[in-house]
Swiss-Prot record:
Catalytic activity line of the entry: a 2-acyl-sn-glycero-3-phosphoethanolamine + a fatty acyl-[ACP] = a 1,2-diacyl-sn-glycero-3-phosphoethanolamine + holo-[ACP]; a long-chain fatty acid + holo-[ACP] + ATP = a long-chain fatty acyl-[ACP] + AMP + diphosphate
EC number: 2.3.1.40, 6.2.1.20
Species of origin: Yersinia pestis (strain Pestoides F)
UniProt keyword terms in alphabetical order: Acyltransferase, ATP-binding, Cell inner membrane, Cell membrane, Ligase, Membrane, Multifunctional enzyme, Nucleotide-binding, Transferase, Transmembrane, Transmembrane helix
One Pfam family, short name: Acyltransferase
One Gene Ontology term from the biological process aspect of the record: fatty acid metabolic process
Alphabetized Gene3D superfamilies for the sequence: 3.30.300.30, N-terminal domain of ligase-like
Name used for this protein in its record: Bifunctional protein Aas
Amino acid sequence: MAYRLLRALFRGLFRVTIDGVTDQFKHEKLIITPNHVSFLDGALLALFLPIKPVFAVYTSITDTWYMRWLKPYVDFVALDPTNPMAIKHLVRMVEQGRPVVIFPEGRITVTGSLMKIYDGAAFVAAKSGAAVVPIRLDGPEFTHFGRLQGVLKTRWFPKISIHVLPATTIPMPQAPRSRERRVLAGEHLHTIMMAARMATVPRETLFEALLSAQTRYGRFKPCIEDVSFKEDSYQTLLKKTLGVSRILQRFTVPGEHVGMLLPNATITAAAIFGASLRGRIPALLNYTSGAKGLQSAIIAASLKTIVTSRQFLEKGKLTHLPEQVNEVNWVYLEDLKDTVTLTDKLWILFHLCFPRRAMLPQQADDSALILFTSGSEGNPKGVVHSHASLLANVEQIRTIADFTPRDRFMSSLPLFHAFGLTVGLFTPLMTGSRVFLYPSPLHYRVVPELVYDRNCTVLFGTSTFLGNYARFAHPYDFARVRYVVAGAEKLAESTKQIWQDKFGIRILEGYGVTECAPVVAINVPMAAKVNTVGRILPGMEARLINVPGIAQGGRLQLRGPNIMRGYLRVENPGVLEQPSAENAQGELDANWYDTGDIVTLDEQGFCAIRGRVKRFAKLAGEMVSLESVEQLAISLSPEGQHAAAAKTDSAKGEALVLFTTDSEITRERLIKVARENGVPELAVPRDIRVVKALPLLGSGKPDFVTLGKMAQDPEMSV
């Protein structure tokens, strides 16, 4: 009777629902592993699961007053973490057929993300051979029984959902020592718990996700700021979004690709969400690519309109672009302010109260946004992402990193790059964190000062940018920073060292590609390994394809929820080319993406980048990584600029060419460094050319197309 009354009370107050594979509880040996978000979790599971399980509870909790009050109603076993026999007792209970609930985190979350996973539950599952049923609890964290007051917008009776995931097993790992087996089993369970989080993420559009964040963290929660130093709340950002959307629909149609040439600013975020909610697909244009790059993007994405700002064009010295690129309609935001009518204002006011009614019908799998590749190996390609792929990458990041609304992001990487867009805009907005948008990562003195002034805790950048910030920053500028992540290029040893020595901060290296929205792997404090880019993100499948001539590693191919919808190419304008990759048998597999990168994956799943397939030279039948050649030069001259290319050679097929800004680099010095590092002499170039500067793309990456031409033609210069 008491159970029925409590169940009815909870269902009435919290609108509790349970979904998923509820017949999973029929296994003979069963362990249930829920996430832990509040003090209500145990009561919810006891009341709503179709079985009566035993709860494994730490002795520090069993002695509390409320556990003594619950003892007549809930079956639990005291678990002493200091007693090794406690695990054996649990194993015996499972083997006897008693379903056991173990909270693998061991404590209630204080971040909203997964906490540390204890390996005890995993070892019990592996030892007993029990089925493991992960459960995802959503909603109790918003109650006053959680530990996220001040982090989330708490309320008395939020809706609670209990998601039951399919059962799985944890095989006993193969390792010589018991301690190693426990650790490996724990990592397996951590993977299961991360997959459970990813499996229960709601399928939303970008605009719906923004509204969900507003509900979750509060409409008046400050969320975004730019160089105007006026911080906007979710409500103010929504108002600007609705305003831009209302104006954009006058000169565009639903489904149209709309070019956007805008800086890192709040209005850019409003333009992206505003276009999206009215069914337009923003194409974020690289303003450093010049007229030629813009024309390629216009052709590939079939653009008719480009939205920009007169002030931005003037400050960026880009006023020549509208004259040189005159095949599209240029729309200036400044000109649109005076066109807002009373009807528009009333429309905005109404939809501030009912924002979901402003959105045109859309699905999560519909095209949401177009980004463009850097063009380092040919014409830039349009990369079309869906709402689902972009938001999946955000959730993958949030699953492994403990970002909270207490964090402040410094976002100086351009929003037209996937790295800047996903980690610098979407991730903080969907996490409730504050973000400061700065228009240029090249202001090496200003960015550290702003990090200090705005109390930023999260900083993303390339190795080059981070190295320069460290050179000009005061030792106290990064005192509050807890996450520094490097991506887009290999992290230089000198950059890593100066951050450690000057600020006491470990840079975490990551890896991504535009086609994956972009993050593929990342080191985080909970799982980091030196000289790797971290583990592949949860929800992604990875496979390595053998490349003839390359002994270590293989060509990385990926599949997952964050993979793009497809390419838009200059050669086939407006036609979406869906992703596919050639498997080991030479057959094309749909929905796989071939990164073109040679990587190795160790036994713990950590990924190390060896180079790009296109950046290997074949010398007398041997494959030599051009990046390894560049690393030799960097070790000799960390401050210089170096890039390697290949040229045709009648004797060996191809020969190496090193371009460098350091005139003191010689073949003899390179040979010495190569011997010290165990690099074969074959990887030391004979042709060393000193240049004033390397040819660079707008992204700051070397222009390998131009370098390849320079390698073939000794007379050609930058």
